[in-house]
């Protein structure tokens, strides 16, 4: 399937069937598009809020934040630790996990925009060392109930929530949680239905830093096992785990 934009429309074209599967009318203020092939919905942000667009071009409101410094559905943690987006569709398309970031406590830092004719100053929130950092939470929006469940990630609030992944049955969400010192990582499983923590599967530590870059990857023929990519021994290797956090074997 080829995805492309033209004249403020987004199209999904199927080469095998030689036809357009979906055509969405876009607004100039929308960004951060995330298409779900399972249900044909398109997640996007409008300002600092998250929306969804159905195949019949009906817009649904996921968040309606009005306070300054609250951002939903966008990439967080300065795009570190493999983070490049802020929305995560469940495999079957029944739910949408997303980041909510509160950066109201973070001071502004004057970045310079050099793409303008004359360079202009553009303040952005940037957490300086030793000062307050932003606080991130993860919501799970159910398309049927139109309600959001928040994962109970707990304290400390300044930890990094990285590498979000869904279980194949859509019942659980896996998150690599990293402390602000970046030297201790916990792979944690949460219930996508209640938000409760289900298990702390394993921990990685390093005297210098731990840098998770990839979410868990489930085996297509075994939903009870996943591959974890790590540099825990100083080299980039793959490890096979079961969903209870037991290391089955080192693959590379």
Mark where each language-model region is:
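Short loop/turn segments that connect beta-strands within beta-propeller blades
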Residues: 15-18, 54-57, 142-146, 192-194, ...
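Repeated scaffold domains used in trafficking and secretory/extracellular systems
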Residues: 30-34, 162, 211-216
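Beta-strand C-termini and the immediately following turn/loop, strongest in propeller blades
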Residues: 2-9, 14-15, 40-49, 54, ...
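Predominantly five- to eight-bladed beta-propeller fold
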Residues: 1-2, 61-87, 98-150
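Beta-propeller and related beta-repeat scaffolds in trafficking/envelope systems
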Residues: 129-134, 156-157, 203-217, 252
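Asp-box/WD-like beta-propeller blade repeats and closely related beta-sheet repeat scaffolds
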Residues: 7-52, 58-86
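Short glycine-/Asp-/Thr-/Trp-enriched loop segments that recur within the blades
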Residues: 68-83, 156-161, 206-213
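Beta-propeller fold detector
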Residues: 21-25, 59-67, 149-152, 197-203, ...
């Amino acid at each position: 399937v080829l995805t492309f934009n033209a004249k403020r429309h987004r199209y999904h074209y199927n080469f095998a069937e030689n036809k357009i599967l979906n055509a969405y009318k876009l607004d100039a203020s929308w960004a951060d598009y995330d298409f779900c092939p399972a249900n044909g919905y398109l997640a996007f942000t409008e300002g600092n809020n998250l929306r969804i667009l159905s195949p019949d071009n009906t817009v649904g409101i996921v968040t309606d934040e009005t306070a300054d410094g609250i951002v939903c559905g966008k990439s967080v943690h300065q795009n570190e630790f493999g983070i490049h987006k802020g929305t995560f569709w469940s495999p079957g398309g029944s739910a949408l996990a997303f980041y909510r970031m509160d950066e109201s406590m973070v001071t502004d830092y004057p970045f310079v925009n050099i793409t303008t004719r004359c360079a202009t100053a553009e303040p952005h929130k940037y957490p300086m060392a030793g000062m307050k950092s932003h606080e991130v939470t993860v919501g799970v929006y159910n398309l049927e109930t139109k309600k959001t469940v928040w994962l109970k990630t707990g304290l400390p609030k300044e930890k990094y929530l990285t590498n979000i992944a869904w279980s194949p049955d859509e019942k659980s969400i896996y998150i690599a949680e990293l402390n602000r010192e970046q030297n201790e990582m916990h792979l944690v499983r949460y219930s996508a239905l209640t938000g409760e923590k289900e298990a702390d599967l394993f921990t990685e530590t390093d005297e210098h830093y731990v840098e998770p870059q990839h979410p868990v990857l489930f085996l297509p023929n075994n939903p009870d096992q996943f591959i974890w990519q790590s540099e825990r021994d100083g080299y980039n290797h793959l490890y096979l785990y079961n969903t209870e956090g037991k290391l089955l074997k080192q693959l590379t």
